[in-house]
Amino acid sequence: MKQIAATSGPTNIGLLSVGSYRPQRVVTNDELCQNIDSSDEWIYSRTGIKTRRFAARDESTASMATEAGREAIAKAGLEASDIDCVVVATSTHFLQTPACGPAVAAALGATGVPAFDISAGCAGFGYALGVAADMVRGGTAGKVLVLGSEKLSPTVDMTDRSNCFIFADGAAGVVVGETPTQGIGPTVWGSDGTQATAIRQDIDWMDYLDRPTGPRPFLRLEGSAVFRWAAFEMGKVGQQAMDAAGVRPDEIDVFLPHQANSRINEILAKSLELRPDAVIANDIEHTGNTSAASIPLAMAEVLATGAAKAGDLALLIGYGAGLSYTAQVVRLPPG
């Protein structure tokens, strides 16, 4: 019987670079408090957020992803023609079709390559990174551009005191390719659909079309439920990722959790028993929660500020809508 040929790729892969894009407009807590009964102190004490970035009207998920991708490609010392695949993690590409990925690939000049979106909420970047890593190891792509890009500000009800101060906009991403030593550990991922309503769009699009003069859809969040789930369940996921990578907690140099809430991140760091001197990303303070963009944005920030350096061992944990989660151990790329 004729055998179908198989593909195989390199054993050792890693992150070749990281690129980011942050919109120019900085939005303070005080500005948001003009629409709600709250204060800068109250918001900061409960979330760790002081400011966040909102994209301009003419900026889109695709345009921000393109800027972040352009920087990531340049920092890797590559040309767009060297990229074999583009994966965009997003939940805020405001077209049902076509996907964001092909437009980003075309804008970058990566012509003819596979390009697609992954929608897994705030865990999206980790999902996309897991898919990209498997593609390179499997030999179906040599270099994959993985992007997280979100424009969440239009999805938020600015009179909703429970979450209008949480979400924000931005994009960042990495190039995945062959490296001399192993730079990406196995992906640990999963979901809990029984809690799907904890982070949700409150009105179905078909229901909205039936009542176009009624209230429009918004993003809603059951903050207490998500806090409990993330703070007390995601530590187990992080430990599983370290076990899968053959790494001990005291060997982790940098902790890069999804930037949802600084209090959650502090609880996770303690439960994971990381070293006291391990760097804990806190990009949320001035960036807010950018969903699928938050982990690569935080990665870019710790490298740019010198808090971390290339080659440091980092634990990534993403979690959010679905509810979905993911974790990996990686070596940080050059900043």
Curated annotation (Swiss-Prot):
It holds the Pfam family ACP_syn_III_C. It is found in: Cytoplasm. Its EC number is 2.3.1.301. Residues 259-263 are annotated as: ACP-binding. It is an enzyme of class 2 (transferase). SUPFAM superfamilies: Thiolase-like. The keyword Signal does not apply. The active site is at residues 122, 258, 289. InterPro entries: ACP_syn_III_C, ACP_syn_III_N, FabH, Thiolase-like. GO terms for molecular function: 3-oxoacyl-[acyl-carrier-protein] synthase activity; beta-ketoacyl-acyl-carrier-protein synthase III activity. Pathway: Lipid metabolism; fatty acid biosynthesis; Lipid metabolism; mycolic acid biosynthesis. GO terms for biological process: fatty acid biosynthetic process. The keyword Transmembrane helix does not apply. It catalyses: malonyl-[ACP] + dodecanoyl-CoA + H(+) = 3-oxotetradecanoyl-[ACP] + CO2 + CoA. Keywords: Acyltransferase, Cytoplasm, Fatty acid biosynthesis, Fatty acid metabolism, Lipid biosynthesis, Lipid metabolism, Multifunctional enzyme, Transferase. GO terms for cellular component: cytoplasm. The last Arg residue of the ACP-binding site is essential for the weak association between ACP/AcpP and FabH. Belongs to the thiolase-like superfamily. FabH family. Homodimer. Catalyzes the condensation reaction of fatty acid synthesis by the addition to an acyl acceptor of two carbons from malonyl-ACP. Catalyzes the first condensation reaction which initiates fatty acid synthesis and may therefore play a role in governing the total rate of fatty acid production. Possesses both acetoacetyl-ACP synthase and acetyl transacylase activities. Its substrate specificity determines the biosynthesis of branched-chain and/or straight-chain of fatty acids. This is Mycobacterial beta-ketoacyl-[acyl-carrier-protein] synthase III. It comes from Mycolicibacterium paratuberculosis (strain ATCC BAA-968 / K-10). The gene is fabH.
